[in-house]
Amino acid sequence: MPDNEVHALFIGWAEARISDRRANAVFRRMAARSGIDRRWSVLAPPPHGTQVVGGFYDGAMPSTAARMAVYAEEAPRLALRAIGQLGPLGRISHIVVASCTGFVAPGIDQIIARALGLPGDVERTLVGFMGCYAAVAALRVAHHIVRSGPDARVLVVMVELTTLHLQGDTEIEPLLGMLQFGDGAGAAIVSAERAGLAMDRFFAATLPDSHDLIRWTIADEGFVMALSGEVPGRIADALADSATRATIVGPGPVDAWAVHAGGRSVLDAVERGLELPATALADSRAVLATCGNMSSATLMFVLARMMAGKRVDNGVAVAFGPGLAAEGFGFRSAA
């Protein structure tokens, strides 16, 4: 994660923008119930920040080009920090990078490879603009690479700078949407070695008539998130459907759930739709509390907590994003 904690600062910034007293009270109440205690940003608060107050833009909103300039500098830096936590990388044959919060060319995959001193014949894949379930797509690509060539060692990286896309809204709904998001990066090595978590049974399920419920649009002043209030209810209904549930749950009893921490209401919907006990999503709720929603990087944080915990015999990882779709995979402790 970055060094700048911004959750409380954002709440103060947002409250100052809501002129209606009743709406302001609703915002404060919803913020208190969000399940989020801390979020982090690459944007530094004063006195180190320049165009920002409390870690966020002040006054005129910067152009998309200005935000992409920050992304080009900060995203590789945060990704390399996450990679550094893996320890010695050893031989790397492939690199797969997922990010939906910025664009730069040469790509962030090339920037990371060059910074790590990887040889020029390392094969690269960039998963872009998929949203919160991009971690699943990146891990799926790595999984198939290793299945095709068991000697492969794939470096997988997710890096998201969601706070770059703060908008100048004064209405409560978009401000509550922005309340959830923070910056973060996660990394892993996918190989045929018997260590960590073993992945299998990748799946996808797109909900019918839901394509407008989550939108991520490139605008003149950053990327704009539109998140319908219908999303949690539609997720709960879909998970209660026997066919969708069978796709996600798979053949056996599940002893661990790694659910993308997309917000308290989303986690509540998953818990309700799958009829899970209150403790089943404890790791996801812990990540939400300490980091917020970091888009594709979030699931990596949940999986890291599970790797540090008890043995998993039949786990399911799942994330939700534009479509509206669920993507995920089965996993178990490898050793």
Give the label of every model feature segment.
Residues M1-V70, G168-D237, D241, R245, ...:
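Condensing-enzyme catalytic core mediating Claisen C-C bond formation in acyl metabolism
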Residues G35-I36, E74-G87, V141, A185, ...:
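Short, well-ordered amphipathic alpha-helical segments that serve as non-catalytic structural scaffolds
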Residues C100-T101, P119-D121, L126-R147, A236, ...:
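Claisen-condensing/thiolase-fold acyl-transfer catalytic domains that form or cleave C-C bonds
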Residues V104-Q110, V156-L176, F203-A219, R264-R272, ...:
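Active-site-adjacent elements of ketosynthase-type condensing enzymes
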